[in-house]
Amino acid sequence: MRQSGRKSNQLRPISLELSPLVNAEGSCLIKIGKTHVICSATCETTVPPFLRGQNQGWVTAEYGMLPSSTSQRIKREAVLGKQGGRTQEIQRLIGRAMRCVIDLKKLGERQIIIDCDVINADGGTRTAAITGSYIALHLAIRLLMKKSILKVNPLISQIAAISCGIYKGETILDLDYLEDSDAEVDINFVFAGNGNLIEVQGTAEKKPFSEEQFLAMLKLAKVGAAELFKLQNQVLLGS
């Protein structure tokens, strides 16, 4: 039994609050257990220099954690004068993942910036950020189409992410911080809506894991992702 009382295949309680921010084209506050992330999507009429004149858009992402989002206060990276390696890795992951589910040609010569700000961290911030960012992106595209800025919907697919790992010899879904910090294996899976993989980030923390164990984690992660896709659809259809 997990310390939280959850079953091995059980997600933490999840909520998706639409449009908590009034200025972004799309936004979402995602809560997965005690991990809370605000995700927003903002549209700009400029693109990176390497895309100018190509009639193609771009999606990029920025990620950050509030100083009090963890048990011990973390210093703002702006004060330190540079982003940490973890921050850069996560925001690149989010940007790559989002670009996989949008037709950049149909976006036209504009850029959508995804901002993910962690309010409270209890494991799985990057996976929560990706799942919430899809909602923000979807709402932004919906608004751009309503305003006739976009004529065709450039979204190709849903996207969601979830962690899976081996903790005390058991394959478990959606690791919280205590589980993540003591797991033998920790893998983040990013899925498209049809179940295809977009990205896999995995590490053996204590000893190597077998192909059989990996496939068991993949199978469990697919079940979790299916629940996330269902929840995304429910909140979007009701908005």
Swiss-Prot record:
**Gene3D superfamilies from the UniProt entry:** GHMP Kinase, N-terminal domain
Q: Which InterPro entries match?
A: ExoRNase_PH_dom1 (IPR001247), ExoRNase_PH_dom2 (IPR015847), ExoRNase_PH_dom2_sf (IPR036345), PNPase/RNase_PH_dom_sf (IPR027408), Ribosomal_Su5_D2-typ_SF (IPR020568), RNase_PH (IPR050080), RNase_PH_bac-type (IPR002381), RNase_PH_CS (IPR018336)
The record ties this protein, via Pfam families, to: RNase_PH, RNase_PH_C
In short, the EC number is 2.7.7.56
Q: Which GO molecular function annotations are given, in alphabetical order? A: 3'-5'-RNA exonuclease activity; tRNA binding; tRNA nucleotidyltransferase activity
Q: Which UniProt keywords apply?
A: Nucleotidyltransferase, RNA-binding, rRNA processing, Transferase, tRNA processing, tRNA-binding
Annotated GO biological processes are:
rRNA catabolic process; rRNA processing; tRNA processing
Asked if the record carries the keyword Lyase, the reply is no
Annotated positions binding phosphate: 86, 124-126
The reaction(s) catalysed by this protein are:
tRNA(n+1) + phosphate = tRNA(n) + a ribonucleoside 5'-diphosphate
Family, as annotated: Belongs to the RNase PH family.
Q: Which PANTHER family does the UniProt entry name for this protein?
A: EXOSOME COMPLEX COMPONENT, EXOSOME COMPLEX COMPONENT RRP41
**Stated role:** Phosphorolytic 3'-5' exoribonuclease that plays an important role in tRNA 3'-end maturation. Removes nucleotide residues following the 3'-CCA terminus of tRNAs; can also add nucleotides to the ends of RNA molecules by using nucleoside diphosphates as substrates, but this may not be physiologically important. Probably plays a role in initiation of 16S rRNA degradation (leading to ribosome degradation) during starvation.
Q: How does it assemble?
A: Homohexameric ring arranged as a trimer of dimers.
Q: What is the designated name of this protein?
A: Ribonuclease PH
Tell me the lineage of the source organism.
Bacteria, Pseudomonadati, Pseudomonadota, Alphaproteobacteria, Rickettsiales
This protein's gene is called: rph
